[in-house]
Amino acid sequence: MFFCFNTLTKKTLKIMTLKNVSDLFENLIDETSKKSEIKIYQEFIQIITSLENKDLSENEIKSIETELDRMKLDSNSLNRGKYYKKALNDFKNYLKETYSLTTKGYYTQLYGGLGLSFGLLFGGAILSNLERSLGLSLGLIAGLVVGSIMGRNKDAQAKISGKTL
């Protein structure tokens, strides 16, 4: 019988720290000329900078860095714009679900969309006695206005409570 006792090498894990992620996206901005990709990278940098400026505990920072590491942001994908857009949306959802942190205008956008949906129903059902297209148009406008106002109020509450990035 032959036993092999090779020394086990310790695999070092490179955790994506907030600083590393910020540097990565700064480099990606320099490498690309596509405006859509630059916008995604700048939004990532803005979120990372906001997180660095927040008073987060050490465990929260480690959790965020682990999530960033799980996303494999340093991989070379063929379609960078699509890959990082999905990563950005996943990261925003993670921050929303885990820490209740939202980006600026999150609720305005969400409630505006809901307002459009309900405005369409309202315009079709209630205002249809005017003229079909006029009723729908007025319903959409009213729904958008009401939804946007509600969303802005919710965004203001999130900002006051410190839940906005």
Q: What residue ranges belong to the model's regions?
A:
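Helix-termini ("caps") and immediately adjacent flexible loops/tails
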Residues: F2-S117, S128-L134, S148-L165
